[in-house]
Amino acid sequence: MSENIKNKIEELFHSTPEGVGVMLGNKITNGEYTGEESIVFTVEKKKPLSELSPEEILPSQVEIDGVTYNTDVFETGLIETFACPSNVTSACYSWQYTPPGNRQTIRPLKGGVSLTSQNLQGYVGTLGFLAVDSATGALVGITNNHVVIADAYYSSFRSTTGILQNETSDSAYQTGDIQPSSSSLKIGEVLRYVPLSAPPTMNQVDGAMVSISQSVMSDSESFKQFGLSGTSVMPFATTSEINALVGNSLTSSSGRSTGVKQGPLCGLAIQGVNYVTGVSGFNLQGQSTVAYFNNCISFTRLNPDCQWPIYPGDSGSALVATIGGVDKIVGLCFAGGSTVGVACRIDIVAEQLGIQAWNGTTPEFVDLTSKKLVTVAGFNNTKTITCSGQTLWQVGVINGVRIC
């Protein structure tokens, strides 16, 4: 995908009304993907043309690099983060009346299972998959920052008069559905996350990393996704493979709330791979805020008119696609509406969070006694600093000084 197309999509996002998302995707007609590449606008709710103000009318065609694209408008509901209050009780929709097994305590640990943290008691999301920390070679668990981090914004967006939160100490628990969480459910500790920026700055990743205790995993089982049929190690898809995903109907996921979504009846389909949208529900010093994201994957049920490709509590789950006969992780799910899910691209997650795919071999494990905390004066938007040869990640705001 050319930079001109990406730039035009962001230009359209900023020039359209609040709440409109934009992507280059697959046109939908009568509830089916047509295969026609088009500029897709997503809206919370469609309205008759007669009810739209002049500013709300979207273009019927868009020209980019001499190519004219027809446009499509797709109703999504409100796009929001999908961790959920842990007391929410909920064919393809059996999860609405029979809680899926993803919510149980799963040992050995696998991807797709219920997760929470000490700093976010009262909420629950999904442990997406196990990966390798590129810096240490240690086995780690991957989820969203809004699943385990109380306030993931860069400190530069915070005020001394607001709530000051940090991740100096934060245990991770599986299952996340039994709260208050007991020590017997602890699987590790939160290590780091990709900090968020407030609008108009764009984000690409809602991601966090937790350590994994050797006692809760297995070399032969923990690379699997709970309930999915695949039994082989899943590599990360490459950038070119993700760019070619639009229309892929061999897409699946397993999450805490909706359970397994796989196969010709209950599977998923990729709608676009460069989605630009605002996402509500991020906590900034106790206030729910909107963050802007670009270069995201949007996905639907195989029938795009069917609801809930993702649901509150599924945040952090892996998005898996079959590419060349091989199941690969293509994204990290983090948001959605009633008819669309949104995932961070795994190539960007890997780069910004500093991870590699786990190949299933016996791994190293994080030595939690080696965790180090330092402080720097003032607020800033620096993700990492180097201290005594170590790379340290921003993890919030604290009163006090422990200078590097």
Model feature map: region roles:
Residues M1, I403-C404:
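Short, solvent-exposed mixed-charge patches
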Residues M1-L130:
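Noncatalytic regulatory segments and standalone regulatory/sensor domains
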Residues T29-G35, D133-A138, I323-K328:
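Short, solvent-exposed loop/turn segments that connect beta-strands within catalytic domains
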Residues V40-T42, G141, A318, G331:
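Structural recognition of the beta-strand scaffold that forms the well-ordered cores
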Residues L49-D65, S222-M234, V342-Q352:
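Surface-exposed flexible segments
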Residues E63, T68-N70, E80, S94-Q96, ...:
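Ser/Thr- (and often Asn-) enriched beta-sheet segments in non-cytosolic proteins
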Residues Q96-P304, P312, A321-I323, F334:
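Serine endopeptidase catalytic core focused on the charge-relay Asp
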Residues S298-L302, P309-I310, V320-C387, T391-L392, ...:
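C-terminal subregion of chymotrypsin/trypsin-like serine protease catalytic domains
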